[in-house]
Amino acid sequence: MAKLTKRMSVIRDKVDATKQYDITEAIALLKELATAKFVESVDVAVNLGIDARKSDQNVRGATVLPNGTGRSVRVAVFAQGANAEAAKAAGAELVGMEDLADQIKKGEMNFDVVIASPDAMRVVGQLGQVLGPRGLMPNPKVGTVTPNVAEAVKNAKAGQVRYRNDKNGIIHTTIGKVDFDTEKLKENLESLLVALKKAKPTQAKGVYIKKISLSTTMGAGVAVDQAGLTAVAN
């Protein structure tokens, strides 16, 4: 049996795996246990009452968190003409068409998000094997294929998170950094849950949001009592 590290031993002693914590208590616990030498992210896992094997029950989308994510996001945009200029004005780090595609083919991928205008997809389509596996392929369902590239750039910079359930029907994403105020983390979580409820497939039956867990980058999961969350109760 592997020996527990001192850090994991402390986490195991502090976190009751059988308990659902009030959201404020859960965040306080995460803050107490975040002892890494960097500012850890606060991540969330939401178990949804969907059948992930059925395509009409899959949940995918994007939402802008009211308090951002605490991350600096570099944006690449495929656009030309007025759209290209608008993307630059909105703060995109990389803007182009075939020239940008050539950079990516060479392995130059110094960006976190890729956005494309619809007319640029003829170029972006050639990059599916490169961008797809990295989760960077633009998609209209998450607002990264859009005629309004400037707005998409602003959203990405403002703290937009993309979400998509895994094969077990679980959404994994981030809601900020552990040094955020407790209220800001709570607001971000509530905002995400509102977006997930709006994205509920009509075919999904029974309890939709089944379980919510919070964790930090290096920490264990802490189950959250949904009774204290406005977005779930309403």
UniProtKB/Swiss-Prot annotation:
Name of the protein described by the UniProt record: Large ribosomal subunit protein uL1
Keywords: Repressor, Ribonucleoprotein, Ribosomal protein, RNA-binding, rRNA-binding, Translation regulation, tRNA-binding
Acetylation recorded as keyword: no
Native species: Enterobacter sp. (strain 638)
UniProt function note: Binds directly to 23S rRNA. The L1 stalk is quite mobile in the ribosome, and is involved in E site tRNA release.
GO molecular function, one term: rRNA binding
Assembly, per entry: Part of the 50S ribosomal subunit.
Similarity comment: family membership: Belongs to the universal ribosomal protein uL1 family.
A Gene Ontology cellular-component term: cytosolic large ribosomal subunit
Transmembrane segments: none
Gene3D superfamilies per record: 3.30.190.20, 3.40.50.790
Matching PROSITE patterns: RIBOSOMAL_L1
